[in-house]
Amino acid sequence: MIKVLIVDDEPLARENLRIFLQEQSDIEIVGECSNAVEGIGAVHKLRPDVLFLDIQMPRISGLEMVGMLDPEHRPYIVFLTAFDEYAIKAFEEHAFDYLLKPIDEARLEKTLARLRQERSKQDVSLLPENQQALKFIPCTGHSRIYLLQMKDVAFVSSRMSGVYVTSHEGKEGFTELTLRTLESRTPLLRCHRQYLVNLAHLQEIRLEDNGQAELILRNGLTVPVSRRYLKSLKEAIGL
């Protein structure tokens, strides 16, 4: 079965696509969302094989949403748009395909045929990594999904239970993004095997006798620095 997630702010557009896909014996619609914030959470939770994604949505567009997904768990992306002018941009965002609204069933059939062919070649549907810088980090916590702006991130830590983002206010949220992805797509600096830090919130570095160090942030929280990353940290702040 091919697991499909639909993200579109237009109820009628979602319904029309759902009706057609439900007629396909090898398609399972695992969820529908009306905006990108819900969509990000659904991708993380439901792990769809294919994401049918509207480009024009309020607050966060479909193109912006793709840039917030972890490339290690990104499904095939089929963009939906009423304007052909978005086609080139869609493929720059590693789209598998794009469909113009209103969706033509014959055109959709061709897309599904290509998807089936790709699925027969491999079991895991991962797309190439998009190196566009992240403006937000999608987080979950306190029974909600929210987008934390980069300027508000104090540090990120990796634990046995996952990756956690701590804000400058000291609030913590879980993210599906890996430390490796965050390091490559944000200004956060690696200071430890399990930590990334936002130097904009750095107040003090305390050096220790064993060659390690500890960062004191403006909010009073501390972040460890290992010997391996101490030199690059000093260089980053001009020492």
From Swiss-Prot:
It comes from the Bacteria. Pfam families: LytTR (PF04397), Response_reg (PF00072). GO terms for molecular function: DNA binding; phosphorelay response regulator activity. PROSITE patterns: HTH_LYTTR (PS50930), RESPONSE_REGULATORY (PS50110). The modification 4-aspartylphosphate is found at D54. CDD domains: REC_LytTR_AlgR-like. Phosphorylated by BtsS. Keywords: DNA-binding, Phosphoprotein, Transcription, Transcription regulation, Two-component regulatory system. SMART domains: LytTR (SM00850), REC (SM00448). Residues 137-239 form the HTH LytTR-type domain. Residues 3-116 form the Response regulatory domain. Member of the two-component regulatory system BtsS/BtsR. BtsR regulates expression of btsT by binding to its promoter region. NCBIfam families: PRK11697.1. This is Transcriptional regulatory protein BtsR. It comes from Shigella flexneri. The gene is btsR.
